[in-house]
Amino acid sequence: YTPFVRVEHGEIRKKDMREITLENNRGVQLIPQLIAPDVDKMELIIALFIEKGYKNVDINLGCPFPLLAKRHNGSGMLPYPEEVRELLTAAIKNHPDLQFSVKMRLGWENPEESLALLPLLNELPLTHIIMHPRLGKQQYKGEVDLKGFEAFYNECRHPLIYNGDLLTVEDIQTISERFPRLAGIMIGRGLLANPALALEYQQGHPLSEKDMQERLRLFHADVLDRKSVV
């Protein structure tokens, strides 16, 4: 997934356009993500995605950044179910050749907001939902709300992907065992702290210090090689 693309001062930010350029993402199955407070801005971004040849689009209903949320972007739209309905139904109705997914939080003020949206979400032909079980007003502070996530998980009829506070192999194992019907787990910030976390989970144990150093050496060499090509 790309960082979200958004409209600023009536135009798509040039930085965001660079992020989704296929030439900058060789060898990656990339899904662009958008964030928008209304249908008009969303359509401007989707038009760019279509121009670039993308067939899958992720809609961000999770960003907690206050300056965006107060304008009903990201998780700031979750308390307004009619706005969510208008945005998502327009995307699907206007673009039948595209596949849409949603990344979201439990709510802005309380987890009942996501539960109130479930009848709408369940009836839409989404490919999947990615859920970060915090409230928008928390930003990244406090604890994830696993009880709130469980309530959503139990009623969600779409493939559901968990995201949030996965920093160790044990964290990933705990979530996958507690929620066995998950379609996937999105590690996110845990990979910044430990780039080998996904590999360690696959292997079932942490890498040795020697193995980690060797893999980091190879990773850096690959980054430099790709940079020289660009």
Locate predicted features.
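Alpha/beta enzyme core
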Residues: 43-57, 61-73, 82-158
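Short glycine-enriched, charge-decorated loop/helix-capping segments at active-site entrances
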Residues: 17-19, 72-78, 138, 202-203
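Glycine-rich, positively charged N-terminal anion/phosphate-binding segment
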Residues: 1-48
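Hydrophobic faces of well-ordered beta-strands that scaffold small-molecule active sites
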Residues: 1-3, 30-34, 57-59, 100-104, ...
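Pocket-edge positions in alpha/beta enzyme catalytic cores
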Residues: 34, 76, 208-211
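Short, charged, surface-exposed secondary-structure boundary motifs
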Residues: 10-13, 139, 194-200
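Active-site beta-loop-alpha junctions enriched in small/polar residues
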Residues: 5-7, 35-37, 62-64, 103-109, ...
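Alpha/beta catalytic cores of nucleotide-metabolism and tRNA/nucleoside-modifying enzymes
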Residues: 90, 99, 111-128, 147, ...
